[in-house]
């Protein structure tokens, strides 16, 4: 006879990787993935990823002089986006498992920004700390992506169209990196602001669990359209339950912390940050419905922008 506790342990052992992926929207391919299947070419097909709407609230307009910030984009822009994530988890007192993903560097060129709300992106030669992923990324050079943006800089949609020879692992890595960057971006208030202005950007992040994300932005400095903005991010789960994909069941969320900070240098005339880094991390604890087995996670992810 198998006890309820033994059944729970077996169930959680099988769901551990699923939970890691479900709760971390930045996951790409884990270090233990079978690259023989993950790197097979797949037919080109574009994917459009809707982005949850933002609510921006001005808390302090800052010092005079003040003026509005409007994202009126023109010309081309070339930047590098780097992302990385660290994920470890432990079931009860078993050995700690590592589901971290290697750092990915993605050169991006924004072009054809004549439309008021559309930004076209071209992917350059992407690289990874994992040589296997770097090899898989090589055929993805020239892939297309795009952003739909408001005049206050809020991103409302992300679309990705990989090149013909893009492999599955490369497609997933690019998609996750861009998605991660979208939810670490910042939009501007409608009202006039000056140095010292503080505003919040509220948005839901949909992964395995719906998270309410509040980004508090502080305008550290401003020189015309160039702004340096400090960010403080906090995520809280909307539910007390983590629903696992593919009807794999659910886990109770016993505790959940996810916070972060960073600084972005932006130009209102360009769609992507010029430079900066944002890191968000925290600890979570889940348990099976019987409460006899506990899954603990430690997660951290970083987005970094540089201009070559």
Regions found by a protein language model. Give the residues of each.
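Bacterial N-terminal signal peptides that target proteins for export
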Residues: 2-16
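Residue-level signal for well-ordered, solvent-exposed loop/turn and beta-edge residues enriched
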Residues: 154, 197, 270-272
């Amino acid at each position: 006879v198998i006890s309820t506790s033994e059944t729970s342990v077996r169930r959680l052992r099988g769901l551990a990787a699923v939970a890691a992926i479900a709760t971390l929207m930045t996951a790409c391919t884990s270090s233990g993935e079978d690259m023989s299947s993950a790197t097979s070419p797949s037919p080109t097909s574009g994917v459009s990823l809707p982005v949850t709407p933002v609510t921006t609230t001005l808390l302090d307009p800052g010092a005079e002089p003040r003026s509005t910030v409007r994202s009126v984009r023109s010309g081309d822009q070339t930047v590098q986006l780097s992302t990385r994530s660290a994920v470890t988890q432990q079931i009860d007192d078993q050995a700690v498992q590592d589901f971290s993903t290697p750092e990915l560097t993605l050169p991006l060129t924004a072009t054809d920004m004549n439309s008021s709300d559309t930004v076209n992106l071209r992917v350059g030669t992407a690289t990874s700390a994992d040589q296997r992923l770097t090899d898989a990324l090589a055929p993805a050079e020239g892939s297309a992506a795009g952003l739909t943006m408001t005049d206050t800089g809020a991103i409302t949609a992300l679309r990705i169209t990989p090149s013909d020879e893009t492999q599955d692992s490369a497609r997933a890595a690019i998609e996750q990196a861009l998605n991660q960057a979208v939810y670490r971006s910042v939009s501007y208030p409608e009202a006039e602001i000056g140095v010292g202005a503080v505003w919040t950007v509220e948005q839901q992040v949909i992964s395995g669990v719906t998270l309410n994300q509040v980004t508090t932005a502080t305008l550290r400095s401003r020189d015309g359209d160039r702004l340096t903005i400090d960010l403080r991010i906090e995520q809280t789960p909307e539910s007390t339950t983590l629903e696992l994909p593919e009807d794999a069941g659910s886990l109770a969320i016993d505790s959940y912390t996810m916070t972060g900070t960073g600084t972005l240098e932006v130009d209102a005339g360009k769609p992507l940050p010029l430079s900066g880094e944002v890191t968000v991390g925290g600890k979570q604890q889940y348990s099976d419905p019987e409460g006899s087995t506990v899954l603990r996670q430690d997660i951290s992810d970083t987005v970094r922008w540089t201009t070559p």
